[in-house]
């Protein structure tokens, strides 16, 4: 259930970006109406503008700084999500045994399976939906930031490094880096689980491809946001799951040397 919700969240996020393009053509201002614009998009647009003014109208640097601020603010939720995922992974062997024990598809057997599953969760203090809540809390914030970048008119009038923020990267460097960092981040996040869930393994490749397509066609400002966010996510995953990944590799190396 939790994995399906996580997959749904990623798909919804991509659909939201794709279907939100019609509104992104409307600049965000203090006169923009609606709860979404007034309380989500406009404040983030103002935050970007504040840092741009602070650094001599450097909107590229402002996007980098604002992205990092948002990521640090969401970090506790990400840590909670990761811990919940690890707790669920630890229960996988027992969950598999229960599914084998109650393999019959009749309603009575399936109800018994659900009861046993809930008892297993309660016994180990695990909430199967705890890892999904952070995803749905983050999505509105990150999507609002996407809108703030796309709808802040001043961003389109400035450049950063080798690219114009209002146009796609002419050298395709940012789209490629965005796709690669998306892949690395997801690879770290799915370490040890992709083989257990074919759907997640599929998303490991699908997400970078879709990000590449979006980044090639969207303004470089959005690609910059993706790259910075992904690099932060990679560092975050390394520090959270790094010891676990190293231990897994050491175990495999030790087993192969025997």
Curated annotation (Swiss-Prot):
It is found in: Cell membrane. The keyword Glycosyltransferase does not apply. A lipid is attached at residue 21 (N-palmitoyl cysteine). The chain crosses the membrane at residues 59-79, 129-149, 160-180, 202-222, 223-243. InterPro entries: YidC/ALB3/OXA1/COX18, YidC/Oxa/ALB_C, YidC/YidC1/YidC2_Firmicutes, YidC_ALB_C. It comes from the Bacteria. It is a multi-pass membrane protein. Keywords: Cell membrane, Chaperone, Lipoprotein, Membrane, Palmitate, Protein transport, Signal, Transmembrane, Transmembrane helix, Transport. One of its GO terms (biological process) is protein insertion into membrane. A lipid is attached at residue 21 (S-diacylglycerol cysteine). It holds the Pfam family 60KD_IMP. GO terms for cellular component: plasma membrane. Belongs to the OXA1/ALB3/YidC family. Type 2 subfamily. Required for the insertion and/or proper folding and/or complex formation of integral membrane proteins into the membrane. Involved in integration of membrane proteins that insert both dependently and independently of the Sec translocase complex, as well as at least some lipoproteins. This is Membrane protein insertase YidC 2. It comes from Bacillus cereus (strain ATCC 14579 / DSM 31 / CCUG 7414 / JCM 2152 / NBRC 15305 / NCIMB 9373 / NCTC 2599 / NRRL B-3711).
């Amino acid at each position: 259930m939790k994995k399906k919700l996580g997959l749904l969240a990623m798909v919804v996020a991509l659909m939201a970006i794709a279907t939100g393009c019609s509104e992104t053509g409307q600049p965000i201002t203090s006169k923009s109406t609606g709860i979404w614009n007034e309380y989500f998009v406009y404040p983030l647009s103002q935050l970007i503008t504040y840092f741009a003014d602070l650094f001599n109208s450097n909107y590229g640097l402002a996007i980098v700084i604002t992205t990092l601020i948002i990521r640090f603010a969401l970090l506790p939720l990400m840590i909670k999500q990761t811990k919940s995922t690890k707790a669920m992974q630890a229960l996988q062997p027992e969950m598999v045994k229960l599914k084998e024990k109650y393999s019959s598809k009749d309603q009575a057997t399936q109800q018994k399976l659900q009861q046993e599953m809930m008892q297993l969760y309660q016994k180990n203090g695990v909430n199967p939906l705890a890892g999904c809540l952070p995803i749905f809390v983050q999505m509105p914030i990150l999507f609002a930031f996407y809108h703030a970048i796309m709808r802040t008119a001043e961003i389109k009038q400035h450049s950063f490094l080798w690219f114009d923020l209002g146009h796609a990267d002419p050298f395709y460097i940012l789209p490629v880096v965005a796709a690669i960092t998306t892949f690395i981040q997801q690879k770290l996040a799915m370490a040890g689980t992709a083989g257990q869930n074919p759907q997640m393994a599929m998303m490991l490749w699908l997400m970078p491809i879709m990000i590449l397509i979006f980044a090639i066609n969207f303004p470089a400002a959005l690609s910059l946001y993706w790259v910075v966010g992904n690099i932060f996510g990679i560092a975050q995953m390394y520090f959270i799951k790094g010891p676990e990944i190293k231990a897994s590799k050491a175990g495999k190396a030790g087993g192969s040397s025997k």
